[in-house]
Amino acid sequence: LFPQVFNGQLFFTNTSSNGLTDFENFLTGNVQFSFGGGGVYNHTYRQNDSAVFVQDNWKATKNLTLNMGLRTEFLGAWTDGACHIGNIESDLTKSGTYPFIYPSCANKLGVSGLTGNAAGSTFNNSVATGLGPRLGFAWDVFGRHSTTLRGGYGIYYDREDIGAVDQLSFQSPFIPIVFFPGTGLANFFAGASPLLNPNAVPPAGTLSSAWVPCLARLVSFTPNNPAGDGSYACTGGPGVNSTQNLFVLEVPRHFRVPNTQQWNLTVQQELGKNWVLEVGYVGTRGIHLRETRDGIQSVNATPQNPFTVTDVNGNHYTITNNTFSNAIARTPTPGLNGYSGYQIFANDAYSIYHSLQTTLSRRWGSNYLQAAYTFSKNIDATSSGNTAFNTAYNDQSNINASRGLSDFDRQHRLAVTYVYQIPAFQHSKGLLHAALGNWAVSGVSIFQSGTPFSILDSGSGDAFLGLGSTPLLGASLAPGASIPSGLTSGSLQSRVAKGYLNPAAFTPASLLYYPNISASECSAPTGPDPSGNTCVTGFGNLGRNIYRGPREQNWDTSLIKFFKIGERNEVRFTADFFNVWNHANFANPAFTDVEVGSAFGKIFNSTGTP
């Protein structure tokens, strides 16, 4: 289980300091950060769900039918029969309270310093209850079956999958995680205590008291000193593994499950003989959706908004600038590492979908034609339930900073489906009928918008987030540029050949203190700050998913031949032709990180058929 954790992982990213892409850094062995863990990995996960419902169909009048129902869900939180999970309540550190939460069964594990008093799920409530009403109607408006109005509304709950409890299994001392710059991987399996080596992890299958966490306390600190990061002591709590060196994972202790509201209103109108038109509005709203982020990222300290820290003796220190060294001290929850050692797995994301959906269809004889067009917009705070990396964009302290078009949004989509019985030679006889009669053609043709994408800067935000904390950091517009100017012009073929994006329209996020020079100049010995400690970047000013990839189309066609066998049987021969025009659908630009150099904004791949 979790081989990627116990074997360790190396990560290669795009880097501005040497101008290399992630793959080039891989080829040269230039590791940006590493990840690994050890400990116990056996679990006995359990979850209990139940539901009751009532439902009835009522024909209120001869023209109106109602469908009504109510479903009540009782969705249980996951527990672990092996008791190898733990949680953390980060806000407790603000009052100096030990933040780690373990189930009461942890007292039976016989590990010195490991105690628990929480429920088996570690949550305050172990069951989430939800009411799911259902209401639908169908109305024959004029009583002639030519005009029908249909509508419906419902709330639907989604049982939480195993992801949440998996997060809890990575808590120290069960599977301590270390997440350090690349050179730290060399010491992962040294076998030393974390007191001697902060990168050490326990051997696989070992549950050791050496990795029971304690809450770190600030002992001394020199504010606004670029080279000073303060010193910490392990004084808070029963353990010895200091939290400023730990990667901790939090799941909010109020258990809730995602739910979706869906509604629709559609009118169906008969248009002459065999033609039917449907026009409808369909909407969906999701709340309590899963997301992962660093909710306690290092704060922005300025002379106008200073940040004050307090040491174990009650001395106060005021921070008015942002450096790499004081990043952990700028964590809003004292003692934790909000710079690169924390992830929250929360159900506080959301989504909203609105659409106009139309369908025009006709049936005549054995023939059929349908054209379905959708004009829609899907917005969310995050489009992924990834549990390994943060899914929020840019500022991790505010989930609304990630609001944008969904990764899978397609503004326009037209699908045409048809079956056509070729009338020629239908009534011929003999060999002519056998060879040329009873042929048909069918197919599906799809035309749709491309999917959205963002312009990224892997070097941005390092004043607030450590390397590897999130893959979704935005770049900035270049001075004088606009969002439309970020796209090149011309035919799609020419843009694929020369570049889909205009590199001159974008720039890496600015340095907080030296906005007019590049990060590489700042870190050079001759730069404004030879130590490099104040050469930190803020977040870019570009939003999430502001551009859209190439539109797509596809034609699939079938040629069908029927052979009659007697009066009641037939044999059908079908030849299928996929992408019959051999039309290439191009993927989004392969590299949208402004740090990658000449590969930026170019399309190198095609995508599958829509």
Per-segment meaning from a language model:
Residues L1, L70-C83, G152-E160, V282-R285, ...:
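Short, solvent-exposed turn/loop segments enriched in Gly/Ser/Thr/Pro and often Arg
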Residues L1-F142, A388-T391:
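Signature of Gram-negative outer-membrane beta-barrel scaffolds
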Residues F2-G38, N87-L109, F170-V240, F307-T310, ...:
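Core domains of carbohydrate- and sulfate-ester-processing enzymes
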Residues A51, N57, G69, G132-W139, ...:
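Short, well-ordered alpha-helical packing segments
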Residues N63, L75-A77, V212, N224-P610:
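Short, solvent-exposed micro-motifs at the edges of structured domains
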Residues G81-H84, A164-Q167, N386, P589-A590:
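Short, glycine/charged-enriched secondary-structure capping and boundary segments
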Residues T122-I162, N259, Q269-N274, L405-Q426:
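Repeat-solenoid scaffold signature
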Residues S146-L185, I287-R293, V441-F447, T451:
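Surface-exposed extracellular loop regions of Gram-negative outer-membrane beta-barrel proteins
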